[in-house]
């Protein structure tokens, strides 16, 4: 049974790879004509900021279609669980890929990827705010005539359906690597994390002090009491992006 599952996982992974890499093509007019706001709205992602791999969380709160390729984005960033900054900007669609074969199973639904670039400016206190820029990919699936976010519930695939790779530039001009995703953070050093048998990544001790301690305590630290674990999980599961502040805020 395990061998069958492994073979199934490998086949699905290859299909995803084939979909994302081999079939990239020019934007399709029928897809671009639709409102793709739903692909970006309410996304929660996690990533790294800087060479020390400080934890950054990103949540997109509002999306509005400007034209066939451009969408206005509003969202909130949180660095090391403490500095929260609202941001606004845009994503631009550059190309669309379609899978050679539609992938649908109990755990996965994917018809292709949308690729593009983004620019988000944090606003508020110049001591903390900056600008995010880079490239993104977003998985999609067709639901009748509607386009919806792709779906993947198999952690073992280590597959990102939402992925942003780029940099963050401070108001003073300091530039840092900054990438985030829904599953596996891109652009991390080889020693950033280890994967367990379930396909979950666990940040290595070297980087934990940079905002990752609570995540480790919530799901992977076996030396804590039930109450301590519960407290850590509440922090991870809270809707931290619901704030009224129009500027950067320190927790």
Briefly describe each language-model feature range.
Residues 1-28:
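Bacterial Sec-dependent N-terminal signal peptides
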Residues 26-59, 69-81, 109-124, 128, ...:
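Tryptophan-anchored aromatic micro-motifs
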Residues 52-59, 93-104, 125-153:
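Charged, amphipathic alpha-helical segments
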Residues 60-66, 91:
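Short, exposed beta-strand/loop patches in secreted or surface proteins that constitute
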Residues 79-87, 92:
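Mid-length scaffold segments of soluble, non-membrane domains
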Residues 179-191:
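Short beta-strand elements
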Residues 212, 217-251:
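Eukaryotic low-complexity, non-globular regulatory regions
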